[in-house]
């Protein structure tokens, strides 16, 4: 046997080493020359052992697998049996290994593509935004305080109230048909906030548990937020939402509501 020169590259596992040997030999992965690849693989393992490198057990398991496949390939093939009712085709001992290598190659190529994209992205540098707080008006500063509260946060809080109402209501109840005005409820909310020193929790505005009243209250709150009469704050996710009353526009809203 000619001496085999092994270059000690870094491989991530036995499949990585096998794929390297197949590519190096320029052979078809669907028709692996087991004898050649096994010889090169074993030479690589022996070289690692001679250099007293730690050989992981998974490499030795693959070596045993290759030797087993090689021995099966050396066995004389059984004659194919054909008749009208039965057809026998001998299984290729390389098939399972071939599928594992194809799957591994697919993941390896995908990982390489992601690595290249990461390299391209690392060449893009962004700068931090300038701090423009000094140029904000007082009203804009107040608006910044609601940046953590979105319509989705409000809807989530409202859905939570509906669930509590569903659990707390009696199994049988009398349905009362009542009409609620959004304008009137807007005025009521502003008055409630004034009584509470200008702030209260979201759920505290839903004192009545009737479905109609809850819907009107929620819509009135959205209208008040739209007109900047109130604003909301939430210190962290899933924490209570606090409603704050703004000064200035509230009187105009109250007068407009009372005129309807």
Curated annotation (Swiss-Prot):
**What Pfam families does the record point to?**
SMC_ScpA
Query: Where would you find this protein in the cell?
Result: Cytoplasm
Mention one GO biological process in which this protein takes part, according to its record.
DNA replication
> Source organism's superkingdom?
Bacteria
Q: Which GO terms describe its cellular component?
A: cytoplasm
Fetch the InterPro entries from UniProt: ScpA (IPR003768), ScpA-like_C (IPR023093)
- Keywords, comma-separated and alphabetical: Cell cycle, Cell division, Chromosome partition, Cytoplasm
General function of this protein: Participates in chromosomal partition during cell division. May act via the formation of a condensin-like complex containing Smc and ScpB that pull DNA away from mid-cell into both cell halves.
HAMAP family documented for this protein: ScpA (MF_01805)
**What PANTHER family would the database entry show?**
SEGREGATION AND CONDENSATION PROTEIN A
Which family does this protein fall into?
Belongs to the ScpA family.
Assembly and partners?
Answer: Component of a cohesin-like complex composed of ScpA, ScpB and the Smc homodimer, in which ScpA and ScpB bind to the head domain of Smc. The presence of the three proteins is required for the association of the complex with DNA.
Which named protein is this?
Segregation and condensation protein A
Species this chain originates from? Halalkalibacterium halodurans (strain ATCC BAA-125 / DSM 18197 / FERM 7344 / JCM 9153 / C-125) (Bacillus halodurans)
């Amino acid at each position: 046997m000619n001496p085999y020169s092994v270059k000690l590259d870094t491989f991530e596992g036995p499949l990585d080493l096998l794929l390297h040997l197949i590519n190096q030999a320029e052979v078809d992965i669907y028709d692996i020359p087991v004898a050649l690849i096994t010889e090169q693989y074993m030479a690589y393992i022996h070289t690692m052992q001679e250099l007293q490198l730690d050989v992981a057990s998974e490499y030795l398991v693959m070596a045993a697998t290759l030797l087993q496949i090689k021995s099966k390939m050396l066995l004389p093939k059984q004659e194919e049996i054909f008749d009208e009712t039965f057809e026998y085709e001998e299984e290729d001992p390389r098939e399972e290994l071939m599928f594992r290598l194809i799957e591994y190659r697919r993941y390896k190529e995908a990982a390489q593509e992601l690595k290249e994209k990461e390299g391209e992205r690392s060449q893009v540098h962004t700068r931090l935004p300038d701090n423009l707080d000094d140029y904000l008006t007082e009203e804009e500063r107040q608006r910044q305080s609601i940046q953590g509260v979105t319509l989705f946060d409000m809807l989530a809080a409202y859905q939570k109230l509906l669930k509590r109402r569903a659990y707390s209501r009696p199994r049988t109840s009398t349905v009362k048909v009542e009409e609620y005005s959004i304008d009137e409820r807007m005025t009521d909310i502003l008055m409630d906030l004034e009584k509470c020193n200008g702030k209260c929790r979201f759920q505290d505005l839903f004192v009545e548990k009737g479905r109609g009243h809850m819907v009107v209250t929620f819509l009135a709150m959205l209208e008040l937020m739209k007109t900047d009469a109130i604003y909301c704050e939430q210190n962290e996710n899933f924490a209570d939402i606090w409603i704050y009353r703004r000064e200035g526009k509230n009187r105009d809203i109250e007068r407009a509501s009372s005129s309807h």
